[in-house]
Amino acid sequence: MSATQDYIVADIGLADFGRKEIAIAETEMPGLMACREEFGASKPLKGARITGSLHMTIQTAVLIETLVALGAEVRWASCNIFSTQDHAAAAIAASGVPVFAVKGETLEEYWTYTDKIFQWADGGVSNMILDDGGDATMYILLGARAEAGENILTNPGSEEEEILFAQIKKRLAATPGWFTRQRDAIKGVTEETTTGVNRLYQLQAKGLLPFPAINVNDSVTKSKFDNKYGCKESLVDGIRRGTDVMMAGKVAVVCGYGDVGKGSAASLSGAGARVKVTEVDPICALQAAMDGYEVVQLEDVVSSADIFITTTGNKDVIRIEHMRAMKDMAIVGNIGHFDNEIQVSALRNLKWTNVKPQVDLIEFPKGNRIILLSEGRLLNLGNATGHPSFVMSASFSNQVLAQIELFTKGEQYKNEVYVLPKQLDEKVARLHLAKLGAKLTELSEEQASYIGVKQQGPFKAEHYRY
């Protein structure tokens, strides 16, 4: 990066390729294009300085350009070291938006880039965060706590935490007071995924959330579509691109049966695999059983299954003792947000053979091998290109509406975690119906009165489960 070049991408020469794919994606993202049409003239995000930490894909490029069209200034990094699509990053950088994202970046680079998305050229600060997984939010809040004298940077629990702490210490030394200034300027954060939402609720419970947050993940048009239908298409895509293994007839184990697990099980089942599910929640376990899947304990199938996928958002779901017992050439991957669902750190002292980017063959002392995809990180983005544009349009439309809500009405919110109101959820769904040729039935005034709703909605109570 030169002194005048405010971006870091793999190859700026890929910008034209990226621009062509962005143009195609726009035709598949009716929600975002409708947001541009509705809000483009009024520019409700004028004055917003958005720090974005979310997978730098073609679909995210359409989101970024929608935010810019609505008046925002944006700085962007990926929220995963393997998920960037380099041509997408190049196209956004070439358009003048600062982006710091390279597929296969190191952890040190990842946290450096997270720092850079808060570094505005004029020395100013961000006033909004758009997050996926919570790393950008956590970076600022941990740094501010360290500035306040809390002893929180001394005992890292992992390699990544060690690198994160080092980056925070570097910034503390270079610019004292920087984290506190950043934190105090933030009007709000909108969070994309389950893992990041869990972090926000934990902060709220401890009284450590210093600004309002909108939980985009639990909008129905995100969790029941992106998490389920997105995974249904992208999981098998990632496994196929990574391994070229035929899934028909194979035994696949899906760890977790939440929305992501449901989509993942459907993905593998649709490819012809015989799917088994592990679950800790009796309700989800019963759902899996009644959907036709055998609900098992991992220990009972670990030596016989062919494919293992984690979807839980928890840690140590597949441990070293499980992988040691797997059959030769078992495939192991994760589609939850972070890389600690699989105990990858416990594999580091074994023999690794890199087959190709994001595909590693790991050999145990007894001679059995496993194929590990994306080093235990999101395989659908590491080994493939993530969810299709159409389903991401629904998720990202929620993000745009949430950013507008907090930026324009932030003072009306307490420092708590909120979800978007039902009418906006229904609006996002409505924006995507025409693309699929779907036509809504309309209630008569008498029918609406009979069930106690307005003719144009919302049609369900807040407690309704879709």
From Swiss-Prot:
Cofactors needed by this protein, per the record, are: NAD(+)
Against Pfam families, the record matches this protein to: AdoHcyase, AdoHcyase_NAD
The enzyme's E.C. designation: 3.13.2.1
Identify the pathway. Answer: Amino-acid biosynthesis; L-homocysteine biosynthesis; L-homocysteine from S-adenosyl-L-homocysteine: step 1/1
Q: What is its main location?
A: cytoplasm
The record's Gene Ontology cellular component field reads:
cytosol
Q: Which residues bind substrate?
A: 57, 132, 192, 222, 226
* Superkingdom, natural source: Bacteria
Please provide the record's keywords in A-Z order. Answer: Cytoplasm, Hydrolase, NAD, One-carbon metabolism
Entries under SUPFAM superfamilies matching the protein: Formate/glycerate dehydrogenase catalytic domain-like (SSF52283), NAD(P)-binding Rossmann-fold domains (SSF51735)
Q: Where found?
A: Cytoplasm
Which EC class heads this enzyme's classification?
hydrolase
GO MF terms on file? adenosylhomocysteinase activity
- Record: residues binding NAD(+): 193-195, 227, 256-261, 279, 314, 335-337, 380
Question: Function, please?
Answer: May play a key role in the regulation of the intracellular concentration of adenosylhomocysteine.
Protein's UniProt name:
Adenosylhomocysteinase
Its organism's taxonomic lineage begins at: Bacteria, Pseudomonadati, Pseudomonadota, Alphaproteobacteria, Hyphomicrobiales
What gene is behind this protein?
A: ahcY
